[in-house]
Amino acid sequence: MIQMQTNLDVADNSGARRVMCIKVLGGSKRKYASVGDIIVVSVKDVIPRGRVKKGDVMKAVVVRTAKDIRRADGSVIRFDRNAAVLVDNKKEPIGTRIFGPVPRELRGKNHMKIVSLAPEVL
């Protein structure tokens, strides 16, 4: 459950380390984002010689949340930290690698490129 002002880790090699959510896309009154949703983020912390700079405003896909994800079979999946992958306007990842596992729910929300780059799909 991601809302405005939430800090997230970046799970790709785009050059950003931490980002902060500044808007949840998908409706004027929408308050929260979950796995697979697109948010607008501001880059807060970067590594040297990365593709993005501190202060850049970008779009990102939420790939891991600390809040439970309930599945149709009754199982629950949750992660230790919130994480996102930076994407361009065509919803393609900016980085070329994804770090850490991603949930199967991304496949249903048409983020196939992120699923294919991930080392593990839960």
UniProtKB/Swiss-Prot annotation:
PANTHER family from the UniProt entry: 50S/60S RIBOSOMAL PROTEIN L14/L23, LARGE RIBOSOMAL SUBUNIT PROTEIN UL14M
One Gene Ontology molecular-function label: structural constituent of ribosome
Gene name for this UniProt entry: rplN1
Any Pfam family hit: Ribosomal_L14
Similarity comment: family membership: Belongs to the universal ribosomal protein uL14 family.
NCBIfam families, per database record: rplN_bact (TIGR01067)
GO terms for biological process, alphabetical: translation
InterPro entries linked to this entry: Ribosomal_uL14, Ribosomal_uL14_bac-type, Ribosomal_uL14_CS, Ribosomal_uL14_sf
Protein known as: Large ribosomal subunit protein uL14
Self-association and partners: Part of the 50S ribosomal subunit. Forms a cluster with proteins L3 and L19. In the 70S ribosome, L14 and L19 interact and together make contacts with the 16S rRNA in bridges B5 and B8.
HAMAP family per the UniProt record, alphabetical: Ribosomal_uL14
UniProt KW keywords: Ribonucleoprotein, Ribosomal protein, RNA-binding, rRNA-binding
Species this protein is from: Bartonella bacilliformis (strain ATCC 35685 / KC583 / Herrer 020/F12,63)
